[in-house]
Amino acid sequence: MPNEFSDETTRLIANFLNEIGLEVIAKQIEIETFLPGILIDRGRIFVDESKLKYAGDLLHEAGHLAFASPEFRLTLSGEVVFPGVSMEPIEVQAIAWSYAAALYLGIDPKIVFHDGGYRGASQGLLFSLSCGVYFGLTGLRQAGMTVFGDDAVNSGIQPYPHMIKWLCD
């Protein structure tokens, strides 16, 4: 359970993910994983805190799971891949999702966009996002997760990075 995490940020993220419907479970992981200390198995996120390098990686991986339907999410294990779909847009959407989640939780986005991630592009991504240069929003809007631009003005709903919902239906 999330309260089994000793790190405050990991606990905060795990609680949030469990609250929105993504199951996070503290568990010792004996196998090598795509990201140290994180194992996706049938849509659940197992976390070995002793091996976890960056708590923010939980939000990014959750961002991938968030775009799967509940039924499809249960089939996802290991490195999250959507068969027959280019992963580039899903990656960009997960970046946008995890940035919004970090702001919602009140944690420094540098926790998600750390120097060890995004193939060396973390600082550039974070700079763009902090300047309001958002990407991945079309997918978030199509999934009903957020609004932006004229849609936000016309609907009276706060625009991204505010999220209407966190998971695809």
Protein language model features and the residues they cover:
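A metal-dependent hydrolase signature that marks the N-terminal structural subdomain at the beginning
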Residues: 1-24, 166
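Short pre-active-site segment immediately N-terminal to the catalytic Zn-binding motif
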Residues: 4, 42-57
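Hydrophobic (often cysteine-bearing) scaffold residues that line and stabilize catalytic clefts
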Residues: 9, 55, 90
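Catalytic zinc-binding patch centered on the HExxH motif and its immediate surroundings
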Residues: 19, 23-42, 119-123
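Post-HEXXH active-site segment of zinc metalloproteases
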Residues: 33-34, 67-98, 118-120
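Active-site recognition of the HExxH zinc-binding catalytic motif
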Residues: 56-69
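Short helix/loop segments within enzyme catalytic domains
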Residues: 101-117
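Pan-zinc metallopeptidase signature
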Residues: 121-169
